[in-house]
Amino acid sequence: MVTLYGGVEGGGTRSKVLLLSEDGQILAEADGLSTNHWLIGTDKCVERINEMVNRAKRKAGVDPLVPLRGLGLSLSGGDQEDAVRMLMEELRDRFPYLSESYLITTDAAGSIATATPDGGVVLISGTGSNCRLINPDGSESGCGGWGHMMGDEGSAYWIAHQAVKIVFDSIDNLEAAPHDIGYVKQAMFNYFQVPDRLGILTHLYRDFDKSRFAGFCRKVAEGAQQGDPLSRCIFRKAGEMLGRHVVAVLPEIDPVLFQGEMGLPILCVGSVWKSWELLKEGFLLALTQGREIQAQNSFSGFTLLKLRHSSALGAASLGAKHIGHLLPMDYSTSAIAFYSYTFS
């Protein structure tokens, strides 16, 4: 009888399941809707997981009544012990044929396990931002990830908000803008389709949509690429804020992570990283300064990586490892390095 291992990438918008053979071959995949239990509740979350795994089983030519050997789930909110325990109980009680064993981890743990064998830093900058350190022993610590009301520094939302605020404060004569506001002001009116600042208030309060507001970041990026000094300045500052998140976790990093040939592996997740060239100056500045204070001797360099495979792959590998089976992983195909730096 065929032995299968499964992995789930549980996102806030979309989810993915991969089924693997014992020798690490991907046999089937299935896509689905959000499986974030904070957004949709535990019941719907486990139903969607069961439905996706069964769909993948059928694609792999396996009877849905034959349980997987192990299922690893990489879920946002997978670090809340009570919620994880409840999810496990629901999966076992309601769907006894789904899998023989389960491991639920954070989305960051699944991501890094897809990219490297020993852990590293996951630095997320999409609509929001977050930084998670996963040490070789599986222990985690982090900085950020508290949402737009408390932070999300360096994210698309933060960049959009900075741009809008600099324009408002400059017109009010509250704070002088570091550069001419002309481009950003006009881009702001065009993007939100309003004639003046009062029109923007609708988008900030009555009709507030975080993703839509964060989307203005794209217009700031376009300005920066065209050479607008204010847009470039905002992105440089965003790079600095993201770098400071890495500096914040330096004291917690197992020295082993500094010693590989790539230096500290930093996995970059989220669409803001598409503008790496605009973030670069501020990012390097923050890490160079932070390193002098925090970890000068051991922190000699780093490599930025991006995933080429779903983090469901890393989740499957962690789920298998949890029951003593090592799935062969080809890290060179599952992640790609796009920037390396050695401190002088």
Swiss-Prot record:
EC number: 2.7.1.59, 2.7.1.-, 2.7.1.60
Residue numbers of Phosphotyrosine PTMs: Y205
Single biological process term from Gene Ontology: N-acetylneuraminate catabolic process
Keyword check for Ligase: no
InterPro entries on file: ATPase_BadF, ATPase_NBD, NAGK-like
Domain of life: Eukaryota
Positions bound to N-acetyl-D-glucosamine: N36, D107, S129, N130, G145, W146, G147, D152
Gene3D superfamilies, per the entry: 3.30.420.40
Pathway where this protein functions: Amino-sugar metabolism; N-acetylneuraminate degradation
Catalytic activity annotation: N-acetyl-D-glucosamine + ATP = N-acetyl-D-glucosamine 6-phosphate + ADP + H(+); aldehydo-N-acetyl-D-mannosamine + ATP = aldehydo-N-acetyl-D-mannosamine 6-phosphate + ADP + H(+); N-acetyl-D-muramoyl-L-alanyl-D-isoglutamine + ATP = 6-O-phospho-N-acetyl-D-muramoyl-L-alanyl-D-isoglutamine + ADP + H(+)
Any one Gene Ontology molecular-function term assigned to this protein's record: N-acetylglucosamine kinase activity
Family assignment from sequence similarity: Belongs to the eukaryotic-type N-acetylglucosamine kinase family.
Function: Converts endogenous N-acetylglucosamine (GlcNAc), a major component of complex carbohydrates, from lysosomal degradation or nutritional sources into GlcNAc 6-phosphate. Also has N-acetylmannosamine (ManNAc) kinase activity. Involved in the N-glycolylneuraminic acid (Neu5Gc) degradation pathway. Also involved in innate immunity by promoting detection of bacterial peptidoglycan by NOD2: acts by catalyzing phosphorylation of muramyl dipeptide (MDP), a fragment of bacterial peptidoglycan, to generate 6-O-phospho-muramyl dipeptide, which acts as a direct ligand for NOD2.
This protein's name: N-acetyl-D-glucosamine kinase
Originating species: Bos taurus (Bovine)
Classification lineage: Eukaryota, Metazoa, Chordata, Craniata, Vertebrata
Gene: NAGK
